[in-house]
Every structure is written in structure tokens, then in C-alpha cells.
Design a protein with these regions (language model features):
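Catalytic NTP-binding/metal-coordinating core of nucleotidyl cyclase/transferase enzymes
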Residues: 15-127
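Substrate-engagement module of ASCE P-loop NTPases
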Residues: 81-87, 128-136, 192-198
Length: 255
């Protein structure tokens, strides 16, 4: 008779399955399924590595010119992404956010679902954005140094981590179909935040007017923002009526 006991090597064990879900969702999946779909106000966050595709193209050219095998050099990009995903997962969890999914070199997450006092959410979400931005620089430098020392190559393309944040309403919950189901957030505000991420450049943290207005109302607010007028040639698709966004540029040192 076959042994059906679950072991640590079983890909369907609880421990292994937990790697495919955000920790909060995995721990509360039964309750979330019973809750169905609900409207929630959340801080939506998208991260993306700017110019990552350009870096990949640059390395492909290098491989064709100088190397017979492309595996090793692209393994270094794999390790860079692994460190980035790991740091993002830790960062989001520690700030009580939910990591919805990795989207290539991008990340979709949201903050506020677990909080009763929403005022605390702002500092956690913005703090997560700043911390991940800072730590990504260390991750980037580590792996670019290896590319240089092991392969004698320093890429021309400079990658950075950009971020978009928006305060809005989403439809969050258990979305079912016979072939595949998912616990996620959808809605117009999610799409809008995704457009903001497309607007951001290099290592910018760009936020919506809605989030900026909310930050201004917080007691003892320490976050500094800069108003940005959207150029005509960079209008947000489907949201052309939006004239301004804001860039988070730091904290008030007086506090």
C-alpha cells in the first residue's frame, strides 16, 4: 500500500503550499472564502524594476559576443530577483500588508485589510515603500558587483525600483471559477494605480492625489511630497482627466 503520509518533501504539504500564498491569506483562507467579495478601502501598491528589460537585452548581447553558454550570467539575474522577492515578502508582511502576486519583475500588494485603525496604515505602507527602495539598492549593488567580478562586465543600464501608491476602493475576496480560483483585489482603483506605476521613472515613489490628501490630514504627518503636473505626452491611459500626481520625496527632519 502506498504511503500517503505528508512529508516535508511533499509539494502539497501545508508548509510547501504556504509558499504560494501571502501568509495572511494562507492563514485565513477558509474565512476569506466564506466572506465572499466585499468592498474595501485599501492602499494599493505596485512595484516594478525600471529598465529591467533593457538590462536583459544588454546581457543577451554580451552572451552572444563573449560566451558560449548563457546559463551562468542569467542565473545572476535569477538570484537578484530572488533576493528582491524575498525582501519584498518580508517587508510587506512586517508592515501588515498583503502580497497579492509577483508580475514578472513587478509586485502587486495592498495595505489596510488587517487594520481596524486606518491611520496606522499610511505610515506602514509608505514606510514599506521607502524601506524596499533602500534595500533594493543594496540588492542591486551586490549582484552587479558579481557580474563585474565574475564576468568582467558592468552593465550600462542602471536598474532601479519604482513604486506607485493609491488610496481607493477595491473588490476584495474569493473569486471562483471551476478551473481556477483566487483571493485577490480588483477594480478601477487597482487599474488606476497600475497606470501610475507606468508613469513613475527610475526610483520614484509616485502617489495619487487621494493618498496625498489623506497623508496631509494625518496628525504629526512627516511625509514630504512634491506635486507633479502630468505632461501631455505622458497622460495616463483611460485616466486622461488626471492632471497631477505626487512624488514622495522623504520625511520632515524636524520630526
Amino acid at each position: 500500500m502506498a504511503n500517503h503520509n505528508v512529508t516535508n518533501n511533499d509539494p502539497h504539504s501545508k508548509e510547501q503550499l504556504s509558499m504560494y500564498f501571502d501568509p495572511f491569506i494562507f492563514s485565513n483562507i477558509k474565512e476569506l472564502k466564506l466572506d465572499g467579495i466585499n468592498i474595501n478601502q485599501l492602499i494599493i501598491v505596485f512595484w516594478d524594476i525600471s529598465k529591467f528589460s533593457a538590462l536583459v537585452k544588454e546581457l543577451k548581447v554580451l552572451v552572444k559576443k563573449r560566451m558560449k553558454k548563457q546559463g551562468p550570467i542569467f542565473h545572476e539575474l535569477e538570484y537578484l530577483l530572488r533576493d528582491y522577492y524575498t525582501e519584498a515578502t518580508r517587508n510587506i508582511k512586517e508592515n501588515d500588508g498583503i502580497l497579492d502576486k509577483f508580475i514578472g519583475d513587478g509586485i502587486f500588494s495592498y495595505f489596510g485589510y488587517q487594520e481596524r485603525e486606518f491611520d496606522q496604515v499610511y505610515s506602514k505602507a509608505v514606510g514599506a515603500a521607502y524601506e524596499l527602495k533602500t534595500n533594493f539598492v543594496k540588492i542591486k549593488e551586490k549582484h552587479l558587483k558579481i557580474l563585474c567580478s565574475h564576468y568582467g562586465y558592468r552593465p550600462i543600464t542602471d536598474i532601479n525600483l519604482k513604486c506607485a501608491m493609491h488610496l481607493g476602493e477595491v473588490l476584495f475576496g474569493y473569486w471562483y471559477s471551476p478551473l481556477r480560483s483566487q483571493i485577490t483585489a480588483i477594480g478601477d482603483d487597482v487599474n488606476f494605480c497600475s497606470r501610475i506605476e507606468g508613469f513613475a521613472e527610475n526610483d520614484q515613489i509616485i502617489i495619487s492625489k487621494e493618498l496625498n490628501d489623506a497623508l496631509r490630514k494625518i496628525n504629526n504627518n512627516t511625509f514630504k511630497t512634491k506635486k507633479i503636473k502630468i505632461p501631455e505626452d505622458k497622460k495616463l491611459k483611460t485616466y486622461e482627466h488626471v492632471k497631477y500626481l505626487y512624488e514622495l520625496i522623504g520625511k520632515d527632519k524636524k520630526n
